Amino acid sequence: MLDKTKRYLIVGLGLLGGKYALELSKAGFHVDGINRSKGHLQYALDHGYIASGKTHDFEDLVSQADHIIFGLYPTALIDWFKTYGHLIKPGCIFTDVSGVKTGLVEPVQAMCPEGVEFIASHPMAGRETSSVEHAAEVSFAPANFIITPTEKNTPEAVQWAKELAEVLGFRHICTLTVQEHDKMIGYVSQLCHAIAVSLMCANDNSSLCEYTGDSFRDLTRIARINEKMWAELFLWNKENLIAEIDQFDSALDQLRDALVADDRDKLEEMFRLSTQRRAAFDKKDS
């Protein structure tokens, strides 16, 4: 079990950073916070997410932390670490929440001071909304938590990440390589967002709300998107995402060709396959 005498620091009190702070504080851990926005920091203080926090002159919070959780975009995390990473004390194990690992894990691990360890992880949870004000709405209970260790990580760090996920309330915890993670995320997350965004951009649907059913609402829920974060994640993982888009295009072309050819058998074959795969997914997910 995690040592409750250890001090935790959340860098970036957004949706996920705020949720980590909330859950750790509820579990009895001392949690401090660093955030650019004074208003969001004050919200976290007022609602008991953190014990203390700063927007600047926070070097003391960094040097006191036993564990750090970075709720930053990949580029911002690397930039922050270049400036303040030397302040992290030996023995500190820290992690992130980023949805892309290639291009992030290796450079940050290379910059770690002696005795400091970065174990990357990805909470597969979130909402269409952002900011700490919506952190309490996020549910970790049904979500997956992915740890992406490298050869530079110790068994102790991997175990800490697993125990952190358990304290936060994640139902399923697994490990993948950095490369496996980014390939998988290109399909199960980024492609889904790309499809939802494309569907909303393909047609002026401003007058459709009176006529749409659940299928349109369900499929486009994630099209309400944080444009800065997702643009960065797409670009950082563009090779994997482009490959998934090409594969999706191929499947959509098969369906289109079947329509053009009035090929009912092909349509029914595709529908049966999708139904079977969804049923298998539901069974594993239950």
Language model features with spans:
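Internal alpha-helical scaffold of NAD(P)-dependent oxidoreductase catalytic cores
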Residues: 137-222
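NAD(P)+-binding Rossmann beta1-loop-alpha1 motif at the extreme N-terminus of oxidoreductases
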Residues: 1-63, 67
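Residues at the starts of beta-strands that form the adenosine-phosphate
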Residues: 7, 30-32, 117, 144, ...
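Rossmann-like NAD(P)(H) cofactor-binding subdomain of soluble oxidoreductases
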Residues: 80-133
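Rossmann-like NAD(P)-binding element
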Residues: 58-88, 92-93
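Interdomain hinge/lid region at the active-site interface
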Residues: 207-277
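Short beta->alpha hinge that forms the Motif I/post-I loop of the SAM-binding pocket
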Residues: 36, 72-73, 97
